[in-house]
């Protein structure tokens, strides 16, 4: 990853913090695997970042009380407004980063964008995102504090949703990332953390997670889940 991409990410987060909305955001997606290097400091955890996607989850959209023109806030950095999908999901595009906002899907499935009127944006509503926001950690990034899902929730969520990925290579990537994180947690004596997070999942979700782990050679993760 080029240093400039990291610097751009940090500058985006810094501006969102200064505008008063970073506290309402949880960083999700592949950037988590990069930032977890600080959580796993001193452990055998190596990662690289090969994505432009920067996914920002707003767990409680109605909690946002300040009006911020996010597109205008980031315009001088080179971000432009783009649209994706037939429904017109808004994302902020830069040669090095693509920022998309997400919200938890509540109620019936909806393919329509969720309006974030105070931010001048919309968000994609997706299932299972509550699992990422119900157990978070805080890490220092530059001079600011950011929220991310606890690594165990991040990993279990990857296993839960990987089957929904249309491309096989994306499924493999998600599974590899999840197993890698879970193995680091096991090796650092946090097997009970994995077990406790797993038990908060509905039985159907648990079955999906176990199924995705069924073909791995090292059985230690499954043994913890089956304890």
What is each PLM-predicted segment?
Residues 1-227:
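Compositionally biased terminal segments of proteins
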